[in-house]
A protein has these predicted regions:
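C-terminal helical cap(s) of enzyme catalytic domains, especially alpha/beta-barrels
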Residues: 134-138, 150-178
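Catalytic cores of alpha/beta
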Residues: 17, 21-26, 120-140, 158-163
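Conserved anion-binding
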Residues: 6, 10-112, 118-121
Length: 178
């Protein structure tokens, strides 16, 4: 058996019933083939409530989009306040936040951050990047999410090892300075 989690990074963002049909009945069998899923709170509490009702054994996790790494995104402080309310009210289901930095929130959830790249600061698609060190030490996130920094590289396997090394080094430096 493998020792990793499968995250369906679909960023669900619809009403509860539509989400339920996609999660339970879609062709990709998301409920059976993933350990965690990502979702936006833009449609309100319905998606979180529905996930909680479906997740009866509490063996699946919900990662809520809290902030985005794209320039000029429309996430507001009101949106973020509501996400934090969901984190408190659905603490057995929401296991983490997709965010740019650790904000106020319980220590029991993971702060996962996209937009990590060691070669670029931004791209032509309005993506803002930062280094693993900045994401982990300065922004106090737990887990980095690297996409294009790996799959746009000619040696992706070697590149994964570099990111792994840099992230672990940053994590150790952060914990030593606490």
């Amino acid at each position: 058996h493998y020792k990793f989690f499968i995250i369906e990074d679909r960023k669900f963002s619809d009403i509860g019933n539509t989400f339920k049909n996609q999660y339970l009945n879609g062709p990709f069998k998301i409920k059976d083939n993933s350990d965690m899923i990502t979702a936006h709170g833009i449609a309100g509490e319905g998606i979180v409530k529905t996930f909680s009702e479906i997740n009866t054994n509490k063996n699946k996790g919900l990662l809520m989009v809290y902030e985005m790494s794209s320039k000029n995104n429309l996430i507001s402080s009101n949106y973020k306040n509501n996400i934090m309310k969901y984190v408190v009210n659905y603490n057995k289901d929401i296991v983490g936040l997709i965010t740019q930095k650790r904000d106020l929130g319980p220590d029991s959830i993971l702060f996962m951050t996209p937009g990590v790249n060691i070669k670029n600061n931004n791209d032509s698609n309005d993506q803002k990047y930062r280094t693993p060190e900045d994401a982990i030490i300065r922004d106090n996130c737990d887990i980095i999410i690297v996409g294009r920094g790996i799959y746009n590289n000619s040696e992706p396997q070697k590149t994964v090892e570099i990111y792994k090394f840099l992230a672990w080094k940053a994590y150790k430096n952060k914990t030593l300075s606490m």
